[in-house]
Amino acid sequence: MKKIMITGALGQIGTELVVKCREIYGTDNVLATDIREPEADSPVQNGPFEILDVTDRDRMFELVRDFEADSLMHMAALLSATAEKNPILAWDLNMGGLMNALEATRTYNLHFFTPSSIGAFGDSTPKVNTPQVTIQQPTTMYGVNKVAGELLCQYYFKRFGVDTRSVRFPGLISHVKEPGGGTTDYAVEIYFKAVREGHYTSFIDKGTYMDMMYMDDAIEAIIKLMEADDAKLETRNGYNLSAMSFDPEMVKEAIQEYYPNFTLDYDVDPIRQGIANSWPDSIDTNCSRGEWGFDPKYDLASMTKLMLEAIEQKDTVKNNN
């Protein structure tokens, strides 16, 4: 990869992906795009940025062509809970945007990455140690979009020889940008509330285990996969990824190592709880580890320490300004 265009660059993943890619490949070699302008304090501000509605095929082609990109990272999407409330919009954005990105990739002979998700699994999927290849059958519009997206990526690889690469992300946890619209958001919100209020009310019930990963490991995984030897990659629809699996009570206990008085209660959101119940408790990542060296560095304990320290520092800086 030498010149990279990133869609959805202001999202939770996109923001940190832009920063890391600019560190590695050079600021001017990474074009960030999104449907809105970045905020004044956004780290995306320090390099090339263009407005892009990913459903606008002509505009996407224009940006790829004018920037002379050799790689496209398509991160723009409507997330799980938001997609469930707006299924038509979700289909139009998630599928229309992906088709435009794949067509741009095919037309301009790009390297291509787009994320799938554990949301691609459903009620009939094995819940524990979920295999790489298994029954999926999701029960949400977001999950349907992700399965269809996986199949499209595989189709473009087999039919047109397009270099498509993807991973099934678990819940991603970061202090840089607070998320919005996801079922796993509680696992980010809980840290901010612990520092700022000493209490959190979870919309996901106790005993609900979901796969998770610290954002640094997720960004590293994207770059490692994109730099991997093409000949070693046997999966083109989406590699299973996970670094840990936990429920809200486990996060509470990890936080109480640093905030002993932190408390947790529950006000379960039936929509997001239903989505979570349809997902695996834990997934098998052996294919990712074996084919391109996936090796996450953070577990719940080390991630908790970093999250709390980072939020404390962020609040200190904000209060001093």
UniProtKB/Swiss-Prot annotation:
One of its GO terms (molecular function) is L-threonine 3-dehydrogenase activity. Pfam families: Epimerase. Coiled coil: none annotated. GO terms for biological process: threonine catabolic process. PANTHER family: L-THREONINE 3-DEHYDROGENASE, L-THREONINE 3-DEHYDROGENASE, MITOCHONDRIAL. Belongs to the NAD(P)-dependent epimerase/dehydratase family. This is Uncharacterized epimerase/dehydratase SAB0504. It comes from Staphylococcus aureus (strain bovine RF122 / ET3-1).
